[in-house]
Amino acid sequence: MAPQPFYQDRGTPIALRQVLHAASELGYRVDLLTFPIGADVEFPGLRIFRADNPFDFRAVPIGLSLRKLLLDASLLAAARGRLASETYTCVHALEEAAWPAALLARRHGIPLLYDMQSSIPEQLRKYMLAHVPPVPMLMARAEQWLLTRADLVVASAGLGTRVRRMAPGTRVREWRFPSAPSEVPHEASLALRRRLGLPADAPVILYSGTFEAYQGLGELIAAIPEVLAGEPSARFILVGADRAGRAALGGAAEELERAGVLTLVERQPRSAMPGYLAMADVLVSPRAFGGNLPLKIFDYLAAGRPIVATNISTHRAVLTRRTAVLVEPAADALAQGIVSVLRSPSKGRELGEAARQYAFEHLGWNRFVRSVGEIYEDAHRRALA
């Protein structure tokens, strides 16, 4: 049960596609129930069922919205129908779909695998209502209820500690999503620089991802003048912009764009991202808060480029000072971290080589497939118990 538009090139659908691909390679038969929006994908053993779309929605934004709530209700109705017509080994439910799935799985006597890509209470922190008593307490209790009802929680890297604290008796694993190092020809990187209007020798600092508030892009924008004071030729590329994201960055970003030192690039297909990452001299993740590790960190590591990231527990779930420069989530600290890499090419090479080695050892496809097999074998044992 996936309450997302599938398939689209954005965080959770990307992760889910990898899980479905692995399950197919392992010979599992999977019925995916998802929103009525997105492109179909084909893997042996996979059937895709889509919830009804009575309002004829063509898109659904990231985050909470009335549109998403209506589609969630449609997904629940479809889930009841699927469980009434088929016999399943387990229910694998993502994000908010896990709450109704917990009740449905119990009613049908099958295990619940809760795929915790993020903490819902954490994601709702950006809304004012989430801070009005007793809403925070109620959200925490709802999350704890779900965690204690799940037979197995598979959480985004960084969330395992939260699960163990809230539900000590629940089995929990953390995802390590695959990202294979890829070789991008130097000529391709130069061509991309030309297309973006970047000088061939300008140091490039690149961010990729959403423009949500928790990503810390405000601090990154504030850090740019400090970086330019030390490295005047530096250029910043932010990939993933949409209209709302551009507006949220404010006037400071507009001034930097006019000055030619900042380029905002709309969301790119996943297949295009290796070229952007290879072009960069520094990859940056200024994330301010949130317990779930962003998928881009796995791609950053595989790219073999030096990483500057905020020193928060989310990043530390995978990154170390051997593979990244970890700094405080503040503009001056981000600037100092970026400049330290630009001024020491040998340090940048060491960080990039260590990052790529980590990806080679820990983020390979076969290793991921084995982990998915272990997860579903656990669920199968529980179904037979």
Report the location of each language-model feature.
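N-terminal subdomain of nucleotide-sugar transferases
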Residues: 1-40, 86, 227
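Membrane-proximal helix-turn-helix segments that form the acceptor-binding/catalytic region
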Residues: 18, 73, 77-81, 99, ...
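A short, active-site helix/loop in glycosyltransferases that binds the activated sugar's phosphate group
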Residues: 36, 123, 136, 140-172, ...
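Conserved donor-binding/catalytic core segment of Leloir-type glycosyltransferases
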Residues: 155, 199-215, 221-224
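A short helix/loop element that forms part of the nucleotide-sugar donor recognition site in Leloir-type
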Residues: 184-198
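Nucleotide-activated donor-binding/catalytic signature segment of Leloir-type glycosyltransferases, i.e.
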Residues: 247-274
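Short hydrophobic beta-strand element within catalytic cores of glycosyltransferases
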Residues: 282-283, 306-309
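Conserved acidic donor-binding segment of nucleotide-sugar-dependent glycosyltransferases
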Residues: 321-332, 340-346
